[in-house]
Regions:
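Bacterial N-terminal signal peptides
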Residues: 10-20
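Aromatic-rich carbohydrate-binding modules that target alpha-glucans
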Residues: 49-99, 109-136
Length: 137
């Protein structure tokens, strides 16, 4: 009887270990590369599979955190304009930028602001949060 319980416990333990290992592997995401130069400009990407819209905001000359009333740059998940695969939840944009230092964030569904988890540097945003930093050479 004790041997039977020990075998049953071992099988149950092994099953739980296998299931928990398999489940945790589903949460590991492929790390995206930080913004980098491509022929047309700087390539930005952000992983947001459940988003309906993702925008790029920053102190770029053409939007300056909306200081001039312009719109944020619209990122795509449609397989066009720098986006590689439509519908994969990876939003992308290629933005022409001159050499300089830029601070930026991603705006998801118009109201949630996020730093770039792949950025090489962040800085205090002056409001208790952080901005991602990009240096274009």
């Amino acid at each position: 009887m004790i041997v039977r319980k020990l075998i049953l416990f071992s099988i149950l333990y092994l099953a739980v270990a296998l299931i928990s290992t398999g489940c945790s592997l589903n949460f590991i995401k492929k790390r995206l590369s930080p913004p980098h130069r491509v022929e047309e400009g700087i390539f930005f990407q952000y992983d947001a599979p459940s988003a309906r819209q993702v925008n790029l905001a920053g102190n770029f000359p053409d939007n300056e955190w909306l200081k001039y009333g312009n719109q944020f740059d619209i990122m795509r998940d449609d397989g066009n304009n720098g986006d590689r695969v439509a519908g994969d939840g990876i939003w992308s944009i290629v933005k022409p930028l001159s050499p300089g230092r830029y601070e930026y964030k991603f705006v998801v569904d118009r109201n949630s602001w996020f730093i770039d988890p792949n950025a090489l540097e962040t800085v205090d945003d002056g409001y208790g949060g952080k901005n991602s930093v990009l240096i274009v050479k």
